[in-house]
């Protein structure tokens, strides 16, 4: 059941139920954050209090310009269209949560703070989001060592009860996710596009219905691929996990490189990098930047992986919890 606060966040900050030819544009993250602080400090105190308010009331209480108040009021007027589209999504197994929900992933609040996505669309078991696990990232094009490593990590997660986090794309993501599910484990895919399309295959649908898989995205469920979205979701993979393993990275370009270097700099979680004789140049450079070498072949049994990662981790930087609910 969508709370009134979440309804307002969806109306103001998503394209759900917004006509393609509409002159209105949803608020961006940078626009929403200062507005959220204004709402909290005002007599409204919560987003839900904006429902049913006039332009003049919004303008006065939040001390906005005429243009800003009209934009908010216009976005808030499509409640019926929002409800209709949410019903359609629910009928195909897609649901939504927002930063106003208490069950929103705490690790995003803790690590990303005001960069936390306002809205998450998901299919499957949302309780998996933020459970102990390993993020596996890398190129779509892998050599044999990379393929073996991705499969090994997926199997290890499945057999040791850890969630396998990935981006749900071809290559590393698919290999590791399939291995985790085949080992009767669980997996989370943070998608950059096409959630509606991703849930259609029967094997994916079965895993979603069993509660072994959750697919989530901060983007519209029917959004097509864009480089910007793919780059933007990389941090969302890392920030749910306890550890990250980079299987293969290009040097100083691409989403894998960007996500790994950002995580190393921010110190969200320990970053391991696959090390082997024919590893790509990007792996070499990530090791120089502070990544921890992950050996191939792994010298221990599958069930030793969690213990090995813990023993070989560099302590991540302490993170202050974001206190705001929305």
Predicted regions located by residue number:
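Long amphipathic alpha-helical segments
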Residues: 1-80
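Glycine-biased, small-residue-rich flexible motifs in mid-sequence functional cores and linkers
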Residues: 1-28, 84-92, 98-326
């Amino acid at each position: 059941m969508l709370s009134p606060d979440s309804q307002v966040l969806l109306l103001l900050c998503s394209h759900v139920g917004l006509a393609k030819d509409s002159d209105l544009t949803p608020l961006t993250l940078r626009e929403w954050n200062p507005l959220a602080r204004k709402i909290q400090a005002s007599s409204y105190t919560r987003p839900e209090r904006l429902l049913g308010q006039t332009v003049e009331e919004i303008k006065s209480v939040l001390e906005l310009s005429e243009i800003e108040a009209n934009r908010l009021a216009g976005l808030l007027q499509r409640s019926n269209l929002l409800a209709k589209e949410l019903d359609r999504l629910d009928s195909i197994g897609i649901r939504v949560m927002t930063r106003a929900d208490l069950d929103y992933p705490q690790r995003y609040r803790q690590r990303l703070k005001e960069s936390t996505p306002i809205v998450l669309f998901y299919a499957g078991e949302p309780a998996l989001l933020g459970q102990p696990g390993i993020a596996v990232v890398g190129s779509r094009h892998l050599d044999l060592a990379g393929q073996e490593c991705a499969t090994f990590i997926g199997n290890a997660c499945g057999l040791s009860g850890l969630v396998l986090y990935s981006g749900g794309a071809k290559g590393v993501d698919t290999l590791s996710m399939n291995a985790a599910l085949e080992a009767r484990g669980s997996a989370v895919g943070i998608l950059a596009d096409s959630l509606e399309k991703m849930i259609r295959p029967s094997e994916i649908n079965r895993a979603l219905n069993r509660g072994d898989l959750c697919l989530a995205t901060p983007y519209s469920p029917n959004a097509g691929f864009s480089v910007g979205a793919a780059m933007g979701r990389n941090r969302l993979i890392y920030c749910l996990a306890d550890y990250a393993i980079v299987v293969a990275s290009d040097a100083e370009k691409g989403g894998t490189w960007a996500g790994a270097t950002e995580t190393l700099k921010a110190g969200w979680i320990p970053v391991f990098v696959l090390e082997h004789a024919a590893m790509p140049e990007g792996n070499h450079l990530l090791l120089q930047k502070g990544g921890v070498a992950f050996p191939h072949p792994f010298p221990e049994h599958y069930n030793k992986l969690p213990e090995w990662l813990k023993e070989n981790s560099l302590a991540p930087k302490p993170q202050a919890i974001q206190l705001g609910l929305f």
